[in-house]
Amino acid sequence: MLTLLSFLAGWAEGWTASGRPDVSISWEQSADGRPKQAAWMSVQGPAAWGQLTVWESGEVAVEAMSVETGELVLSEQLAVASDYELLAIIRRLVAACEV
């Protein structure tokens, strides 16, 4: 499942390279040697800011909080088995932060 971590990193780098000014995205990956590898992406948009974490096991945690009210607009814990499933979650997070 390390491909999920690579997919998240590649997607985040692609977004950043696209130069879209409306939503800012950054990402990090856990240090080598940790027993359970993970990568996470932070998203800041005009409507919300959020974070998505994916572990090599396929577990995903995603949250987004309204900039205006501080309330959660997205909060999920789930498991994915493919890049396609992870992409759908990434898109939901970005959409929540853009609106």
Language model regions located:
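Mixed-charge, Lys/Arg-enriched low-complexity segments
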Residues: 1-3, 73-99
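Short, Lys/Arg-enriched charge-dense amphipathic segments
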Residues: 42-54, 91-97
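Intrinsically disordered, low-complexity regulatory segments enriched in Ser/Thr/Pro
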Residues: 50-80
